[in-house]
Amino acid sequence: YKWQLIPATAYLEYERTGNRKIMEVPYDANRQALNTLMLAELAEGKGRFIDQLLNGAYMSCEMNSWVLSAHLPRQSSKRSLPDFREQIIDLGSGGYGALMAWVHYFFRKPFDKINPVVSLQTY
């Protein structure tokens, strides 16, 4: 899977035009890929998907927020770029957090063998 970057302009598109899809399509694809890779590795158990899981977990931790752009105007700034200084939650970010908790729970040990920084971020 090729992890998709969500640029600032994808978040801003909601504020500019009301288009949520430009941010949500890659967000949903990345989240679905992480979920699928987790289930595939749990089913197979051969380590074939660990590197991609590590990439997805690391990339997810690098995001300022897992909240959808259409819900970010709930921040005090009322803007659509995530402000790392203010934490808000929506159903999508709650689901993403739950997925990351499962990824951490099941794959902490294999991640630690590669580099413990990823497990520290997902904790």
Segments and roles (model prediction):
Residues 1-15:
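Low-complexity, Ser/Thr/Pro/Gly-enriched N-terminal "stalk/linker" regions
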Residues 24-123:
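Aromatic-lined, polymer-binding surfaces characteristic
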Residues 18-19:
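Intrinsically disordered, low-complexity acidic/Q/S/K-rich activation/interaction tracts characteristic
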